[in-house]
C-alpha cells in the first residue's frame, strides 16, 4: 500500500514541531520520504515470511512499512518520549512488538533464543554504527541479513575492496563474517532534521557457510589484523614487529603471497590476509 508522500511528510513534521524535538544525544534524524521506505523494503526483500528487527523506529515512518509487509517486527526504542506515540500509532498491529530499551544494553541472547533467519532493517544513530554492527554480528547464527542506513563514508569503508583507501579494520571486521554491499546513496535532505552529511543504505549478508571462520579462528585473525592496521601509514613489515616478527621475515612472507616489501594492510582481502597469516606461522 502506497502512502501519500506529501501528506505523511507533513504529518511527521507536525509531530516533531508540536510534540517531539529530535534529540541530538540519540542521534535522531527521521526519514521523511515514503518512496525511500518502499525502496528499502524492496531491496531488503521483506515479505510475509520475514521476521524483522528494527533499531530506533523514531516516528515510525519506516516502521509502518515494515509492519505492513513482514511476518513480525520487533523494534527497540530508547527515547521515553516516543514510546506513547509509537504504542498509540501501532496499537492494533498484532505483528508488532515495541521494546522500550537501549539496544546496546539489550540481552539479545534472550531475544534470539526462539528466532532464526531474522533480518535487521534500521536507520541507526551514526555515532554508534560500529558498536551496533559488532553487536549484531555476535548473533550471526540467528541473523540472515542486515540493512542499515549509515553515514555515506562509513558505508564506503565497510563495503570497500583491497587497495582502496577506505579499506580498514572495520572493513575486515564485517567482511570476515559477511558480504557487505553499498546499495545506494541517500541525500541528507531525506531526513528531518537535515544532517550535515549524506547517508547510504548498506547491505550485510551473513556468510552462513562460515567461509572464513572455517579456515582460521577469529581470535587469531584479529590478533594479526589489529597489528597490521595499527598504523596505516606504515608497512605491514613495520607493524607486525609488535608481534615479535623481524621486518626481514615479514618481507619474505609478503613476497610469497605476491605482495611487495612495502605492502600495507589495506592491500589485503580477507582471504588474502588469511593466506598471509598461514605463511607467517609456517
Annotate each predicted stretch with a short phrase.
Residues 227-282:
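C-terminal lobe and adjacent flexible extensions of AdoMet/dcAdoMet transferase-like proteins
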Residues 1-219, 223-227, 266:
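Catalytic cores of RNA-modifying enzymes
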Amino acid at each position: 500500500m502506497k502512502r501519500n508522500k506529501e501528506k505523511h511528510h507533513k504529518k511527521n513534521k507536525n509531530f516533531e514541531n508540536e510534540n517531539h524535538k529530535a534529540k541530538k544525544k540519540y542521534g535522531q534524524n527521521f526519514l521523511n520520504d515514503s518512496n525511500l521506505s518502499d525502496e528499502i523494503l524492496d531491496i531488503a526483500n521483506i515479505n510475509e515470511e520475514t521476521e524483522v528487527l528494527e533499531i530506533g523506529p523514531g516516528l515510525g515512518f519506516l516502521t509502518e512499512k515494515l509492519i505492513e509487509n513482514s511476518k513480525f517486527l520487533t523494534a527497540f526504542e530508547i527515547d521515553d518520549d516516543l514510546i506513547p506515540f509509537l504504542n498509540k500509532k501501532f496499537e492494533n498491529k498484532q505483528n508488532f512488538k515495541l521494546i522500550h530499551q537501549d539496544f546496546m544494553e539489550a540481552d539479545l541472547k534472550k531475544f534470539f533464543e526462539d528466532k532464526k533467519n531474522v533480518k535487521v532493517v534500521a536507520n541507526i544513530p551514526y555515532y554508534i554504527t560500529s558498536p551496533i554492527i559488532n553487536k549484531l554480528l555476535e548473533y550471526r547464527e540467528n541473523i540472515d541479513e542486515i540493512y542499515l542506513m549509515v553515514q555515506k563514508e562509513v558505508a564506503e569503508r565497510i563495503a570497500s575492496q583491497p587497495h582502496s583507501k577506505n579499506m580498514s579494520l572495520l572493513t575486515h571486521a564485517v567482511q570476515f563474517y559477511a558480504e557487505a554491499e553499498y546499495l545506494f546513496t541517500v541525500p541528507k535532505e531525506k531526513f528531518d532534521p537535515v544532517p550535515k552529511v549524506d547517508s547510504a543504505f548498506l547491505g550485510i549478508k551473513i556468510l552462513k557457510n562460515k567461509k572464513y571462520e572455517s579456515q582460521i579462528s577469529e581470535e587469531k585473525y584479529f590478533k594479526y589484523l589489529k597489528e597490521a592496521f595499527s598504523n596505516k601509514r606504515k608497512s605491514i613489515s613495520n607493524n607486525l614487529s609488535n608481534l615479535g616478527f623481524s621486518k626481514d621475515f615479514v618481507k619474505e612472507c609478503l613476497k610469497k603471497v605476491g605482495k611487495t616489501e612495502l605492502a600495507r594492510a589495506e592491500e589485503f582481502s580477507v582471504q588474502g590476509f588469511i593466506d598471509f597469516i598461514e605463511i607467517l606461522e609456517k
